[in-house]
A protein has these predicted regions:
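Helix N-cap motif at beta-to-alpha junctions
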Residues: 9-13, 44-49
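Short amphipathic alpha-helices in soluble, non-transmembrane regions
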Residues: 19-22, 51-61
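BRCT (BRCA1 C-terminal) domain core and associated BRCT-interaction motifs
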Residues: 31-48
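Conserved short beta-strand edge segments in small beta-sheet-based binding/regulatory domains
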Residues: 27-32, 57-67
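N-terminal acidic leader/helix
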Residues: 1-34
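Hydrophobic beta-strand residues in large extracellular and virion-surface proteins
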Residues: 6, 20, 38-42, 55
């Protein structure tokens, strides 16, 4: 099993959580960053990589909007 730590902007946490539930990925909230992002640890198998890429893309889209 692989693990990925993702910093999720608060503005997209609901959408992020929906994707986690949709793909039934094991996850844990680890804390928050100084910037107010929520640190989420996601555990996944190799076959679930595409779901993790989707999560990362969502976060990147919201992060790009902030810049």
């Amino acid at each position: 099993m692989k693990t990925k730590e993702i910093n999720v902007p608060v503005i997209c946490i609901a959408e992020f959580a929906d994707l986690l539930a949709e793909y039934d990925l094991t996850n844990e909230i680890m804390g928050s960053t100084e910037a107010g992002e929520i640190i989420v640890e996601v555990q996944y198998e190799k076959e679930e990589r595409q779901a993790v890429f989707e999560l990362l893309e969502l976060v990147e889209d919201y992060s790009a909007d902030d810049n």
